[in-house]
């Protein structure tokens, strides 16, 4: 029996929520290990739509333990709102079904204020953040001045942490023309929210290791995508955490030996939200068609996603950096009706052909795609649950992707409904 890590293998929005929900039915524990409430996921269960951005996808399934690991930065006010919204939808949430790492870092109102002020004043190179304070919270974590969940339990410690934080943030705020932090107001907000968060606080590393020893199935749920990884993404147009599969161990404290199968989620075409290089981007009728058919708008921000053809170069790269065992290919049905499809198989940079995306931002921006054309199909793939249900051209398209990315397809998703899935390899089997 293998524990499974699910990671996005593009720029996020690959359909991880559906796949995680599909797998979570057989998992005992579903753990998030990085990111914040900046990456949303949509679940469709029995015709009912759930939109989550912080809580693990398993939270909507009774009898499962959902975990927010130490690698996550936690906005406690958003947490309480998301819990309340799900409860209103009939989802039961208690400390028996939700556990938060005691050493998870808190996102405070001052982090969002700093995030938005920087982005609004940065006319040279906007990063395209969601403005929710994720980046500044990670900065404070690395700078050893963050407030963590456990700090909420002791008022004296909390006051010391706030004072240390203010030394840094007030200096930044002066430079940006923002009023200083209101110390007493912040402390009052934290005291008020503490009783609503602390019941869920646990030593996640300990519980997770105990679960592993007891033979429980663990599903690690990544947010965003590997091309937004702070080290291996299109820097600086990235998120502020490691997104690749190795972070599942670091972000929960369970150790890399616990990971048995890495499932990379890959859309049958490519999308990106916000700024940054996108070699295979389409700024024509085909790009508009992909966006309309795929309903490419962000779950959290509502921002329109940029669309392009499938980029095999990037996915091959992310499969390598995450050690992907197999991919789940999603949204194949969006390609129904295209007479011709294209796959990016390489880049040209200054007259030279490349088989990978260079690390330097200026070179990334100058890369032009080299496309391979494939025959499209007119039949519908929506709702297909076996290879026999797929048009021959669609099967050829999937097989060509496998060849180019040097990684097999483990799952194929053909609609937002969780059961419209073709299983090739069961990630939970050893």
Swiss-Prot record:
Binding positions (Mg(2+)): 13, 40
GO biological process: 'de novo' AMP biosynthetic process; IMP metabolic process
InterPro entries xref list: Adenylosuccin_syn_GTP-bd, Adenylosuccin_syn_Lys_AS, Adenylosuccinate_synth_dom1, Adenylosuccinate_synth_dom2, Adenylosuccinate_synth_dom3, Adenylosuccinate_synthetase, P-loop_NTPase
Pathway(s) per entry: Purine metabolism; AMP biosynthesis via de novo pathway; AMP from IMP: step 1/2
Keyword Nucleotide-binding: yes
Family per similarity comment: Belongs to the adenylosuccinate synthetase family.
Binding site for GTP: 12-18, 40-42, 305, 331-333, 413-415
Subunit (UniProt): Homodimer.
EC number: 6.3.4.4
Listed name of the protein: Adenylosuccinate synthetase
Active site: 13, 41
């Amino acid at each position: 029996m293998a524990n499974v890590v699910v990671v996005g293998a593009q720029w996020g929005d690959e359909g991880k929520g559906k796949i995680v929900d599909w797998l979570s039915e057989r998992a005992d524990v579903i753990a998030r290990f990085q990111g914040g409430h900046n990456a949303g996921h949509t679940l469709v269960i029995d015709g009912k739509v759930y939109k989550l951005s912080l809580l693990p996808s398993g939270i909507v399934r009774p009898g499962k333990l959902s975990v927010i690991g130490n690698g996550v930065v936690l906005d406690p006010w958003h947490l309480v709102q998301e819990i309340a919204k799900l409860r209103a939808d009939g989802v039961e949430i208690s400390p028996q079904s939700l556990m938060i790492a005691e050493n998870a870092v808190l996102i405070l109102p001052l982090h969002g204020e700093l995030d938005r002020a920087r982005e609004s004043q940065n006319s040279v190179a906007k990063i395209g953040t969601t403005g929710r304070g994720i980046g500044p919270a990670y900065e404070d974590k690395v700078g050893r001045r963050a407030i963590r969940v456990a700090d909420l339990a002791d008022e004296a410690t909390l006051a010391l942490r706030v004072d240390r934080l203010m030394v840094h943030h007030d200096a930044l705020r002066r430079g940006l023309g923002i009023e200083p932090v209101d110390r007493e107001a912040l402390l009052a907000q934290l005291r008020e929210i503490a009783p609503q968060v602390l019941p869920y606080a646990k030593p996640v590393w300990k519980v997770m290791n105990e679960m592993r020893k007891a033979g429980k199935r663990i599903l690690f749920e990544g947010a965003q995508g590997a091309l937004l990884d702070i080290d291996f993404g299109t820097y600086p147009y990235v998120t502020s955490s490691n997104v690749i599969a190795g972070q599942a161990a670091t972000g929960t404290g369970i150790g890399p030996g616990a990971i048995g199968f890495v499932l990379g989620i890959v859309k049958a075409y490519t999308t990106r939200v916000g700024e940054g290089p996108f070699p295979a981007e389409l700024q024509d009728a085909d790009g508009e068609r992909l966006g309309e058919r795929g309903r490419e708008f962000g779950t959290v921000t509502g921002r329109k996603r940029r669309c392009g053809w499938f980029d095999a170069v990037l996915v091959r790269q992310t499969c390598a950096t995450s050690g992907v065992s197999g991919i789940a290919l999603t949204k194949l049905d969006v390609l129904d009706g295209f007479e011709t499809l294209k796959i990016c198989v390489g880049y040209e940079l200054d007259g030279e052909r490349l088989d990978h995306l260079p690390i330097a931002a200026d070179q990334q921006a100058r890369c032009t795609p080299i496309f391979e054309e494939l025959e499209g199909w007119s039949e519908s793939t929506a709702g297909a649950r076996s290879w026999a249900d797929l048009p021959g051209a669609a099967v050829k398209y999937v097989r060509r992707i496998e060849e180019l990315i040097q990684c097999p397809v483990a799952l194929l998703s053909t609609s937002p409904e969780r059961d419209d899935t073709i299983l090739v390899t069961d990630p939970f089997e050893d």
